[in-house]
């Protein structure tokens, strides 16, 4: 491990709070320094992860003692055990993708904003395929499934230690820490921009839509999001059953993002409705694919809710209900102009 473990949660709380504050300051200062920081951390993470994965793949293919060879069963859906395992895995995939589409939320702050954010979100899917499949192939066979299960909370660090010893394990630990820090920064930036967009239409309090004259960022919204994140981190680390809490958070967040992407796909179909019948490629791109994603994600949500514990169901229902209440408040109490805007549609031309 990179740091010595402690029986007290307070050292972890202190370190986590400091890291969140650092990423919050970077997010407030500006999008350029945020992007450069994210790129620097990402490059280190990917070099380590891909390098160790290739190392593990060569190690497994070399048939070293204790390794488990790659088989076709690794890539077969028939190898998924247990009722609901497929939908649970897909839900985790949705959770893992959330945050990789952050470029969409900063579309007003990037060059060529009509095309670059969307392309980056699609490009992220290709990156994810490499980042998740390659480690699965390269690291799963390094040691026995029983040992991987016994070290499930730090599997990447354990496998790296098997391959190269404690020194390389610490390098992997640093990469994982940077991954968490980068995700924290992404969450602050994306959430603050979402809040800014909603506040600018008076769906949320106007204070969240204020832009700092000095930094040209939604500073107040970023600070509020950062404080909420700190409070959530404290609650999580002080929980008596951290493992269960983490599992519940992943599942509930995955369900909420699945619902979010369903609504996004529906909005895309409505916005591009004039292009659906213009030509075959447009029909596939802005009609068939979004509709297929709606059906697919709806199936994932239904299957996941059927097998979810009551606590997770109530959490999802409660959050959605709270969102509906806030929507009605914005519509009928705050008189948000958003609900009075004309329905927009893209020009009837070739999709860029």
What are the language-model segments listed below?
Residues 1-4, 122-188, 204-253:
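TM-loop-TM module centered on a large, flexible mid-protein loop between adjacent transmembrane helices
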Residues 8-11, 37, 208-216, 258-309:
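C-terminal membrane-solvent junction of multi-pass transporters and transport-like membrane proteins
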Residues 265-289, 310-352:
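Terminal cytosolic tails of multi-pass membrane transporters
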Residues 1-11, 43, 48-51, 107-127, ...:
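Helix-loop-helix connectors at the membrane interface of multi-pass transporters/channels
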Residues 223-233, 287-304, 320-323:
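Hydrophobic membrane-spanning alpha-helices of multi-pass integral membrane proteins
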Residues 4-11, 40-173:
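Helix-loop-helix junctions that connect adjacent transmembrane segments
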Residues 11-68, 98, 121-125, 256-259, ...:
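Membrane-interface loop-to-helix entry segments
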């Amino acid at each position: 491990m990179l740091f010595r473990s402690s029986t007290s949660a307070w050292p972890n709380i202190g370190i986590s709070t400091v890291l969140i504050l650092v990423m919050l300051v970077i997010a407030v200062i500006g999008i350029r320094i945020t992007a450069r920081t994210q790129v620097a951390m990402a490059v280190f993470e990917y070099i380590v992860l891909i390098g160790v994965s290739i190392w593990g793949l060569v190690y497994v293919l070399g048939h070293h003692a204790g390794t488990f060879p790659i088989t076709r069963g690794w890539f077969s859906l028939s190898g998924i055990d247990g009722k609901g395992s497929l939908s649970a895995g897909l839900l985790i995939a949705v959770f893992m993708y959330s945050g990789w589409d952050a470029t969409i939320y900063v579309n007003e702050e990037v060059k060529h904003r009509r095309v670059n954010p969307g392309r980056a979100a699609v490009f992220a899917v290709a990156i994810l395929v490499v980042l998740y499949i390659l480690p699965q192939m390269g690291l799963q066979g390094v040691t026995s499934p029983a040992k991987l299960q016994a070290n499930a909370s730090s599997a990447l660090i354990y496998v790296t230690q098997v391959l190269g010893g404690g020194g390389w394990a610490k390098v992997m630990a640093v990469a994982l820490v940077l991954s968490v820090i980068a995700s924290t920064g992404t969450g602050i930036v994306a959430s603050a921009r979402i809040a800014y967009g909603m506040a600018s239409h008076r769906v949320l309090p106007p204070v969240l839509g204020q832009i700092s004259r000095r930094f040209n960022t939604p500073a107040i919204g970023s600070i509020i999001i950062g404080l909420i994140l700190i409070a959530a981190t404290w609650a999580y680390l002080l929980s008596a059953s951290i493992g269960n809490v983490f599992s519940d958070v992943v599942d509930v967040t995955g369900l909420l993002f699945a619902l979010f992407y369903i609504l996004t796909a529906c909005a895309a179909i409505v916005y591009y409705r004039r292009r659906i019948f213009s030509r075959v490629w447009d029909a596939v791109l802005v009609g068939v694919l979004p509709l297929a994603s709606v059906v697919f994600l709806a199936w994932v949500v239904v299957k996941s809710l059927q097998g979810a514990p009551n606590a997770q169901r109530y959490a999802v229902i409660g959050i959605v209900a709270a969102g509906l209440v806030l929507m009605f408040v914005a519509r009928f109490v705050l008189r948000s102009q958003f609900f009075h805007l004309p329905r927009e549609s893209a020009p009837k031309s070739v999709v860029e």
